[in-house]
Amino acid sequence: MTEPWQPDEAMAAFIELDHDRARRRGYPEAVYCEGKTPGQVRSAALAIKASGTTTLFTRAGPAHTKSVLSVLPDARYDEDARMLAWPPEPPAPRGGRVLVVAAGTADFGVAREVQLTAVYLGRAADLVTDVGIAGLHRILARLDQLRSARVIVVVAGMDGALPGLVAGLVSAPVIAVPTSVGYGAAFGDRKSVV
């Protein structure tokens, strides 16, 4: 008699982690948890533990988090970012400072995910929140901080106007990260990616 098929165990055969990524590319492996079962994420965590590979688990829901922590109990978990990092201590920062700017408090979770990703990629990263264009004075009050950053990541929903505003104030590269929050009028659901 054959054993019943176990989808999570069968899926483990298809998980091919890139254990050499950090050396080859300069950044660690990441496991995108959304869309995976907790068992599949646990299988990935087991493979990571066996290899000792630095890894980020992103978009981790409560069941994913429980699965990872059952295998890697010392993994660092950030509820706002919905992310786990293992090993829990990030590398020493090197290179220029990253500034993550969140337009509104609804953008905070994505902004925190960006900040922690930068930290685990070995960059010093600061987070500025609730500086959307509805209160221009708030972003202008941070002008010195904006201008001292090596790169700026702007996380914004609504109409997505903040990245353009910030880019006009600084000489550093500005990366726009659209979110699906807000009720802006531009182009329906596609407003902040156009």
Predicted features and spans:
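Long amphipathic alpha-helical segments
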Residues: 1-75
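Short glycine/serine/threonine-rich phosphate/pyrophosphate-binding segments
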Residues: 39-41, 107-112, 136-137, 156-165, ...
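Short glycine-rich or small-residue beta-strand-to-loop segments that form or flank ligand, phosphate
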Residues: 28-31, 97-103, 152-154
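Arg/Lys-rich RNA-binding interfaces used to dock onto structured RNA substrates
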Residues: 11-12, 20-24, 68-99, 103
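Glycine-rich oxoanion-binding loops at beta->alpha junctions
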Residues: 83-85, 124-148, 190
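Glycine-rich phosphate/diphosphate-binding loop of Rossmann-like nucleotide-binding domains
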Residues: 94-137
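Glycine-rich phosphate-binding loop
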Residues: 141-179
